[in-house]
Amino acid sequence: MIFDKEDFESFDPELWAAIHAEEIRQQQNIELIASENIVSKAVMAAQGSVLTNKYAEGYPGKRYYGGTEAVDVVENLAIDRAKELFGAKFANVQPHSGSQANAAAYMALIQPGDTVLGMDLNAGGHLTHGASVNFSGKTYHFVPYGVNPQTELLDYEEILKIAKEVQPKLIVAGASAYSRLIDFAKFRQIADSVGAKLMVDMAHIAGLVATGAHPNPLPYADVVTTTTHKTLRGPRGGMILTNDEVLAKKINSAIFPGTQGGPLEHVIAAKAVAFKEALDPEFATYIEQVIKNTQAMADEFAKVDGLRLIAGGSDNHLLNLKVLDLGINGKEAQDLLDSVHITLNKEAIPDETLSPFKTSGVRIGAAAITSRGFKEAEARKVAQLVSKALVNHDNQEKLEEVRKSALELTHQFPL
């Protein structure tokens, strides 16, 4: 029977080869994609457990299927740990992704066609913050806000001005490519001044919030959404937090039956593991090192003529670089670095002139390399290698030197 096929490699060699190739890539490459990380074996074990066999529509104690006693325990553990981790009164751990979490939060907070303020994509916002190609921009009337063109920092006075002009029902704070601290108290003041709700998407900074390395949005936001991977170092998934009991009920309904059916209890189990790991004091040490590594890289990039640090540097786990002045666009930089065992992604910048498929910049994060064991010395070396490749993008001899150095570095810190 097929269920007896325990030898994955011999049963499905094509798929096994692809997975093995990805394992080799992760071993050999310096991972700088800011939304990626390296999870623990415990997280992977939970996600690969027998819980994947179980359907459990509904919520603990109120399921539409029988035999859910064990998964109720699993989900309640995840909920309780999430609440403890972020100081929330209510947590929904069922969203399959951050986008699913945002979709449900919108359903709970506003109606189709309502006006919403969200961060512009070029300024560092996310697709689900109102991009015209996304469900958010198609379903709701999003008005974008950006950053100050000189400082490239959030301009709270300008955001207030826009809010007063358009009178939004909801303001969305949070970003996917913003390297500085976000003042949630100011966002709360702006929202209150126009009678709007405040939603914070902390997907990128959740790990920092959990340890106090970034201000917690929970005291200010009506609803907080997040992913459970990225800096939180858990499985790919989403979560919604609130301190409002009425909104909590609306959120639960928006997830099930509103936007999802059965929850992925094996993923929820992995979330529970990650939350327990994040509650350990060692996780705070990890996040502290992430920030140190990011700032070490920023210091090195600041020395390179032709590279420009967006917003002048970083307060969190990521930084953005304009590379166009080196005669290479973001997509070309991404492909070039991938060829020398360094992985990052192209990124639009606030004064973007190119298409989203090219971009003028790249985004760099330190979460994964820190999980691998890199400290400031290695982070500086990484920045030097990235810079060397970008500056010498048409010099094959120099690129080969970078490739060898990158392999030597990853060999010193095996996964």
UniProtKB/Swiss-Prot annotation:
It comes from the Bacteria. GO terms for biological process: glycine biosynthetic process from serine; tetrahydrofolate interconversion. The lineage of its organism: Bacteria, Bacillati, Bacillota, Bacilli, Lactobacillales. Its main location: cytoplasm. One of its GO terms (cellular component) is cytosol. The modification N6-(pyridoxal phosphate)lysine is found at K230. InterPro entries: PyrdxlP-dep_Trfase (IPR015424), PyrdxlP-dep_Trfase_major (IPR015421), PyrdxlP-dep_Trfase_small (IPR015422), Ser_HO-MeTrfase (IPR001085), Ser_HO-MeTrfase-like (IPR049943), Ser_HO-MeTrfase_PLP_BS (IPR019798), SHMT-like_dom (IPR039429). It holds the Pfam family SHMT. Catalyzes the reversible interconversion of serine and glycine with tetrahydrofolate (THF) serving as the one-carbon carrier. This reaction serves as the major source of one-carbon groups required for the biosynthesis of purines, thymidylate, methionine, and other important biomolecules. Also exhibits THF-independent aldolase activity toward beta-hydroxyamino acids, producing glycine and aldehydes, via a retro-aldol mechanism. Pathway: One-carbon metabolism; tetrahydrofolate interconversion; Amino-acid biosynthesis; glycine biosynthesis; glycine from L-serine: step 1/1. It catalyses: (6R)-5,10-methylene-5,6,7,8-tetrahydrofolate + glycine + H2O = (6S)-5,6,7,8-tetrahydrofolate + L-serine. Belongs to the SHMT family. Its cofactor is pyridoxal 5'-phosphate. It is found in: Cytoplasm. This is Serine hydroxymethyltransferase. (6S)-5,6,7,8-tetrahydrofolate binds at L121, G125, H126, L127, S355, P356, F357. One of its GO terms (molecular function) is glycine hydroxymethyltransferase activity. Its EC number is 2.1.2.1. The keyword Metal-binding does not apply. Homodimer. It comes from Lactococcus lactis subsp. cremoris (strain MG1363). The record marks H229 as: Plays an important role in substrate specificity. It is an enzyme of class 2 (transferase). Keywords: Amino-acid biosynthesis, Cytoplasm, One-carbon metabolism, Pyridoxal phosphate, Transferase.
